């Protein structure tokens, strides 16, 4: 086997494990962001980081043929929350610039976005479980493909 084919095989065999890892890490990270915001630590970049990870996980999950279609539910719900967040931010800025305090938009955003994100978290865990059931030997397959690729790379 040549190096290029080994690299393609490594990519293909490690994809389920990478996707599984992302589908576990993303909801844990979202929960940590929730907890940090309850403590009073708000950082605007967390949402962007989560969005990027969700995008990559969704692209990788779409290439997993053995997993059911509900693997797309959690990322789509996160896209919806990001889009609604932008719309609600515009509403907040509009209300504040009109002389209001912004409380209506903030209350509306918490009533809409939080349940959607909680449902997305649940679907991330459900999808991770589906990936684990569809690819029971994914970790071993990824390690074996990585070792084979590294051996070929060292030999050349």
What are these regions (language model features)?
Residues 1-34:
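Cytosolic juxtamembrane helix and N-cap/initiation of the first transmembrane helix
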Residues 7, 11, 50, 91-94, ...:
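Residue-level detector of alpha-helical secondary structure
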Residues 21-25, 46-49, 74-84, 105-112, ...:
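Physicochemical signature of membrane-embedded alpha-helices that form the seven-helix bundle of GPCRs
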Residues 32, 39-62, 80-88, 116-117:
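Generic alpha-helical transmembrane segments
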Residues 34-52, 94-109:
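Membrane-helix interface and helix-disruption motif detector
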Residues 41, 66-69, 94-101, 129-136:
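Transmembrane helix-loop junctions in multipass membrane proteins, especially transporters and channels
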Residues 58-66, 119-152:
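Cytosolic juxtamembrane helix at the C-terminal end of the final transmembrane segment
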Residues 59-94, 105-107:
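Loop-to-transmembrane helix junctions at the membrane interface
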